[in-house]
């Protein structure tokens, strides 16, 4: 389907179909991928503005409009409803041109599974709700501090330590030393355990002072009743709480204030946004973002950060007040949206009062430091890509660089990784994982050369077909913008780096020769021992130094490819090892394996169980019980079969 800009009549007809109502619009490319999601109180005028005066648009949006082949719209009852819908659509589809925030890292959250009788508490980077009752606290910028805090919390409050019981019929050591209340043997009621966990949640909500007062009152009540053992236990919790809150040095005069403070520093291309989280008068969190600032007003950047940040947090993380450095274009709309999300009033202020303005100034100073650091990092990456271009004799600095590595143990669970750097920085949304399919690579036999050749064939076969159809894929090397192409063949690399030496490089080039792409790709390899760079057809490595910027960039790429491959290999190996021997029994699928282990608690117990005991397990009948028993006792079953055979008649 051709872009709408090349079909003026079709474009005009399509624009007239869009109603002047509030709602959301979705712009799609020729492959039906969503490029951009937006909202407006008048869909028709907003969408028309993208195609009326293109000179007023940012370069990013101009690039987007050249690729729009279809426009969809969803009408809503109000602009506030459109804002909530837009947030959900962006969260679900992650359109390329909606990604304002440049950070691809995912901040960690703390999850408490309130839906369970004995809730678990753990750190995660994925906000996936199993139940509406579960809660995510965060995000937290320092995962190390979060881990230390959770470690201390589990020392202060007795909490369940394991997702599953260690022993089926008795408690473990954690119960004996007072670190677990004996959840596995129900030594504590669900109500009492929830009561303890509510205190823990107050720590992560920044309500430490309130919790301290509550524990003080509880300790005094125990002391008045002469229950000194319980009073001492609460006293220890109070002392532990002091240790937990010791790092929260910055505070406000009013200890009841909870607010978020946002400010930015920007130049004509980049903006650094800082978000300080104040809870009960204390600074409990600080989040930093870098954003695309081209042709965007500071207030609009702050508004987009607010929309993206608060669409990713639970209602408990929305404070009653936000302080912002610049006025927001749709401040009232955002207040209504946040109020609906929090279910209590939320106000946004651009403060003039001295105390609040001083807070904004403090956050802005931090944003300026982050902007300087981000710009220095960009300059360093630019120098590195320029140096790499000189090293590989390329006409322009490479934008998209891909690194590949293989991971296995003697051929078992063999996998490969593809990592991507764009402009010298990791682009994790483009990472790929491969399972090695070749039958010649299996447990006990490894062939890294064949594995790497297989990955090259799988990675570039689509490009080989395109070249056979007449696409000049080699010309893409000289466009300097392949990382942003979105014409269906959007992932042509400027450089391919192989982790290994001349052997791996030769295997890769042979595979590319089969695809007729060996002259179109810039390929190199980086040997581990001396950090030597090899090029195809060259017996000697390039003259380079290990600390050279271009070599250092390749080394970072190689190390990231190795890390990604090893982590995927460990995941695959772990999943294989977790698969029970029960899976090999005909008629026993994953659900039945789970039910059997839940009933008998271990493989050993299943192995020792009689047919009668096995048949009493949920979902197991007599016939299947015999099969399971026979699987573990083949000799016994064979003997029974022989005894059950009828004697044959012998004739003289």
Swiss-Prot record:
Example of a GO biological process term: SOS response
Family annotation (InterPro entries): GIY-YIG_endonuc, GIY-YIG_endonuc_sf, GIY-YIG_UvrC_Cho, Hlx-hairpin-Hlx_DNA-bd_motif, RuvA_2-like, UVR_dom, UVR_dom_sf, UvrABC_protein_C
Pfam families according to UniProt: GIY-YIG (PF01541), HHH_5 (PF14520), UVR (PF02151), UvrC_RNaseH (PF22920), UvrC_RNaseH_dom (PF08459)
UniProt xrefs under SMART domains: GIYc, HhH1
A single GO molecular function term of this UniProt record: excinuclease ABC activity
Occurrences of domain UVR (ranges): 209-244
Gene Ontology CC terms, in alphabetical order: cytoplasm; excinuclease repair complex
Keywords: Cytoplasm, DNA damage, DNA excision, DNA repair, Excision nuclease, SOS response
Domain named GIY-YIG: residues: 20-99
Cell compartments where the protein resides: Cytoplasm
Annotated family: Belongs to the UvrC family.
Complex formation: Interacts with UvrB in an incision complex.
Functional summary from the UniProt entry: The UvrABC repair system catalyzes the recognition and processing of DNA lesions. UvrC both incises the 5' and 3' sides of the lesion. The N-terminal half is responsible for the 3' incision and the C-terminal half is responsible for the 5' incision.
Entry protein name: UvrABC system protein C
Species, as recorded: Parasynechococcus marenigrum (strain WH8102)
Gene name linked to the record: uvrC
């Amino acid at each position: 389907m051709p872009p709408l800009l090349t079909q003026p009549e079709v474009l005009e007809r399509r624009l007239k179909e869009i109603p002047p109502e509030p709602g959301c619009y979705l712009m799609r490319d020729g492959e039906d991928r969503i490029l951009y999601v937006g909202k407006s109180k008048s869909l028709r005028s907003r969408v028309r503005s993208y195609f009326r005066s293109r000179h007023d648009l940012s370069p990013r949006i101009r690039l987007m409009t050249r690729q729009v082949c279809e426009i969809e719209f969803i009408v809503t009852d109000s602009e506030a409803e459109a804002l909530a819908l837009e947030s959900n659509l962006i969260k679900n589809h992650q359109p390329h041109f909606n990604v304002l925030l440049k950070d691809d890292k995912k901040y960690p959250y703390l999850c408490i599974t309130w839906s369970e009788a004995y809730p678990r508490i753990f750190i995660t980077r994925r906000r996936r709700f199993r139940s509406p009752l579960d809660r995510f606290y965060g995000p937290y910028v320092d995962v190390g501090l979060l881990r230390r805090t959770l470690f201390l919390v589990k020392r202060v409050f007795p909490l369940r330590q394991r997702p599953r019981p260690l022993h089926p019929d008795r408690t473990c050591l954690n119960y004996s030393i007072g670190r677990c209340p004996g959840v596995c043997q129900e030594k504590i009621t669900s109500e009492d355990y929830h009561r303890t966990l509510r205190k823990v949640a107050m720590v992560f909500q920044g309500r430490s002072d309130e919790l301290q007062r509550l524990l003080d009152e509880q300790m005094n009540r125990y002391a008045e009743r002469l229950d000194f053992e319980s009073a001492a236990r609460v006293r220890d919790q109070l002392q532990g709480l002091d240790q937990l809150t010791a790092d929260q040095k910055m505070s406000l005069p009013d200890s009841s204030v909870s607010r978020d403070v946002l400010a930015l520093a920007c130049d004509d291309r980049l903006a650094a946004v800082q978000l300080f989280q104040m809870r009960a008068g204390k600074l409990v969190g600080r989040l930093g973002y870098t954003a695309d600032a081209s042709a965007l007003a500071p207030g609009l950047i702050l508004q987009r950060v607010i929309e993206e940040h608060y669409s990713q947090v639970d209602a408990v993380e929305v404070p009653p007040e936000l302080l912002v450095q610049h006025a927001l274009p749709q401040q009232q709309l955002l207040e209504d949206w946040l109020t609906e999300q929090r279910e209590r009033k939320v106000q946004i202020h651009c403060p003039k009062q001295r105390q609040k303005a001083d807070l904004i100034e403090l956050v802005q100073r931090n944003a300026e430091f982050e902007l300087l650091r981000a710009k220095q990092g960009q300059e360093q990456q630019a120098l590195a890509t320029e140096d790499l271009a000189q090293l590989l004799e390329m006409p322009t600095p490479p934008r998209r660089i891909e690194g590949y590595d293989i991971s296995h143990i003697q051929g078992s669970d063999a996998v490969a990784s593809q990592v991507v750097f764009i402009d010298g920085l990791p682009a994790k949304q483009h990472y790929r994982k491969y399972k090695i399919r070749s039958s010649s690579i299996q447990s006990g036999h490894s062939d890294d050369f064949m594995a790497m050749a297989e990955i090259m064939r799988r990675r570039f076969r689509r490009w080989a077909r395109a070249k056979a159809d007449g696409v000049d894929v080699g010309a893409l090397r000289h466009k300097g913008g392949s990382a942003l192409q979105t014409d269906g063949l959007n992932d042509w690399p400027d450089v391919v780096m192989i982790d290994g030496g001349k052997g791996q490089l030769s295997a890769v080039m042979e595979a590319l020769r089969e695809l007729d792409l060996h002259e179109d790709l810039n390929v190199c390899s980086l040997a581990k021992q001396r950090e030597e760079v090899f090029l195809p057809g060259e017996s000697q490595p390039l003259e380079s130094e290990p600390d050279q910027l271009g070599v250092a960039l390749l080394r970072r790429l190689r190390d990231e490819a190795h890390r990604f491959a090893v982590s995927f290999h460990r995941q695959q190996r772990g999943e294989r090892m977790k698969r029970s021997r029960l899976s090999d029994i005909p008629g026993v699928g994953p659900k039945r394996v789970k039910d059997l282990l839940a009933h008998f608690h271990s493989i050993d117990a299943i192995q020792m169980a009689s047919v009668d005991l096995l048949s009493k397990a949920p979902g197991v009948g007599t016939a299947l019980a015999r099969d399971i028993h026979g699987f573990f006792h083949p000799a016994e079953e064979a003997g029974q079969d022989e005894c059950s055979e009828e004697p044959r008649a012998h004739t003289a």
